[in-house]
Amino acid sequence: MTNIRKIHPLMKIMNNSFIDLPAPSNISSWWNFGSLLGACLALQIVTGLFLAMHYTADTTTAFSSVTHICRDVNYGWVIRYLHTNGASMFFLCLFIHVGRGLYYGSFSLSETWNIGIILLLTVMATAFMGYVLPWGQMSFWGATVITNLLSAIPYIGSDLVEWIWGGFSVDKATLTRFFAFHFILPLIIAALVMVHLLFLHETGFNNPLGVSSNPDKIPFHPYYTTKDLLGVILLILPLMTLVLFFPDLLGDPDNYTPANPLNTPPHIKPEWYFLFAYAILRSIPNKLGEVLALISSILILAIIPLLQTAKQQSMMFRPLSQCLFWVLVADLYTLTWIGGQPVENPFITIGQAASILYFSLILIIMPMVSLIENKMLKW
């Protein structure tokens, strides 16, 4: 008799996606981050739902409602800090996931890669709007500065900003719509994840060697379900350490001051996971230029498949490209550090140099080095 999981219409989909899915026998722990991102998304949706039950999206009560959650709601502080620090873990996994795709040439699966970029942009938009909701000083001024960048768009810029604000400044209308979008976007992200997986299962997995996975495949369960479960446990450890011992380590002290439109904080900066893009934005003195640089810093991922000159898909056997990849990682670390520093020398100069290096590495240096490697390996 055929197992019910293979014939039941609903269970069959689950079975083909997570149980009998043919997976390469040699994918390493770097492939764990997809499932960790799924776990992070589930955590964010659940904790966010409970927070939404007690939060009020009104400028007069938003800040006090967050305080009420932390002080008066049973385990409200755990839910709140799981949500804020869960976002940090989400982005950490996202960056590693994208980095793994770059290192092992997963961008050759173009549909999966492009949906991934859309997912990255959607998650960034969701996180930005979520940061505005507690209505602290950094929430208010972060929203003002970032939304105001749209005024650099010719002709329609000013109208667009006022349309997003719902008035002539960041106010009640802005907070209400940001809460509405912050609530609905994770559900859209979940739908996009399904599309991401659909395309991935159409083409099959990449693997560390960058060769065809077809000759040797194993079922996803129990091998990779067990491996993913270990990954989830290892992710829970640092997350719970942050939540229970250092809940405000990654936050900004200014956000514990209620929003005040008449008092600008000395250093306006976003959460740590946006600092690299913020540093690139700040390194250009022209307003339209900085908006284009900010967008390009993410959308540059979309043209990476077009810049691929290497004859080998993976960087596994390309030591020069490996060195450049880690230079790129170090450059992103530098940009993240610079984004959190005040706008003064030498930070401005370092930020500009790191921004130029970031674009040069991806657009010029890495494709050229790949061509040199082709010659060296006599491809």
Swiss-Prot record:
Family, per entry: Belongs to the cytochrome b family.
Compartment(s) where it occurs, according to its Swiss-Prot or TrEMBL record: Mitochondrion inner membrane
Organism of provenance: Avahi laniger
Entry's cofactor comment: Binds 2 heme b groups non-covalently.
Keyword field contains Transmembrane: yes
Function, in words: Component of the ubiquinol-cytochrome c reductase complex (complex III or cytochrome b-c1 complex) that is part of the mitochondrial respiratory chain. The b-c1 complex mediates electron transfer from ubiquinol to cytochrome c. Contributes to the generation of a proton gradient across the mitochondrial membrane that is then used for ATP synthesis.
Lipid bilayer topology: Multi-pass membrane protein
Keywords: Electron transport, Heme, Iron, Membrane, Metal-binding, Mitochondrion, Mitochondrion inner membrane, Respiratory chain, Transmembrane, Transmembrane helix, Transport, Ubiquinone
A GO cellular component annotation in the UniProt record: respiratory chain complex III
Protein name according to UniProt: Cytochrome b
GO BP terms in the entry: mitochondrial electron transport, ubiquinol to cytochrome c
InterPro entries from the UniProt entry: Cyt_b/b6_C (IPR005798), Cyt_b/b6_C_sf (IPR036150), Cyt_b/b6_N (IPR005797), Cytb/b6-like_sf (IPR027387), Cytochrome_b (IPR030689), Cytochrome_b_C_euk/bac (IPR048260), Cytochrome_b_N_euk/bac (IPR048259), Di-haem_cyt_TM (IPR016174)
Cofactor dependency: heme b
Annotated residues for binding of heme b b566: 97, 196
Record: residues binding heme b b562: 83, 182
Keyword Transmembrane: yes
A Pfam family the protein falls into: Cytochrom_B_C
Principal cellular location given in the protein's record: mitochondrion
More details: Heme 1 (or BL or b562) is low-potential and absorbs at about 562 nm, and heme 2 (or BH or b566) is high-potential and absorbs at about 566 nm.
Positions with a binding annotation for a ubiquinone: 201
Molecular function in Gene Ontology: metal ion binding; ubiquinol-cytochrome-c reductase activity
